């Protein structure tokens, strides 16, 4: 878990804020069992079947998020990928398109959308290359460097 995650989630629980875990992963038939066990092992609150959704066949979390939002006032989305917030960010080969989408939601970043760094997840690479595992060539390194140094918006 990220440093401070347990303390933050316990703070939420102590203040009557329910936490829903919506994840997409594929680890075979026991994927759900592994995910729930991991949350319990870490001592995270609301580690139960009501609050955990594991998507094995898709990374699209929006349907489940919308279901939760019907019954709850969702105050923040936490994730390591723009796709964790809304599906509209799932654009391949279109860094400029993702930036444009972010610009439309500018007021949500840092308030409703909190992005965690995670260099082990390659989904952000698909926005650049159309593939989460592009070949490690000099040309691809230059493409990645150019995309990584592009600013979504200037700081005012």
Residue map of PLM features:
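C-terminal cap/substrate-recognition subdomain and adjoining C-terminal extension
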Residues: 26, 30-156
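Short, acidic loop-to-helix structural element flanking the phosphoryl-transfer center
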Residues: 1-20, 27-33
């Amino acid at each position: 878990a990220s440093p401070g995650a347990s303390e933050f989630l316990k703070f939420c629980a102590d203040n009557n804020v329910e936490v829903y875990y919506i994840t997409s992963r594929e680890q075979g038939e026991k994927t759900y069992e592994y995910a729930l066990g991991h949350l319990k092992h870490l001592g995270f609150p609301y580690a139960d079947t009501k609050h955990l959704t594991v998507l094995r066949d898709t990374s699209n979390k929006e349907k489940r998020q919308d279901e939760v939002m019907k019954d709850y006032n969702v105050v923040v989305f936490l994730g390591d990928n723009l796709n964790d917030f809304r599906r509209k960010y799932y654009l391949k080969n279109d860094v400029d398109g993702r930036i444009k989408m972010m610009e439309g939601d500018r007021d949500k970043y840092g308030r409703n959308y909190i992005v965690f760094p995670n260099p082990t997840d390659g989904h952000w690479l698909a926005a650049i290359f159309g593939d989460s595992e592009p070949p490690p060539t000099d040309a691809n390194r230059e493409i990645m460097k150019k995309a990584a140094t592009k600013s979504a918006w200037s700081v005012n």
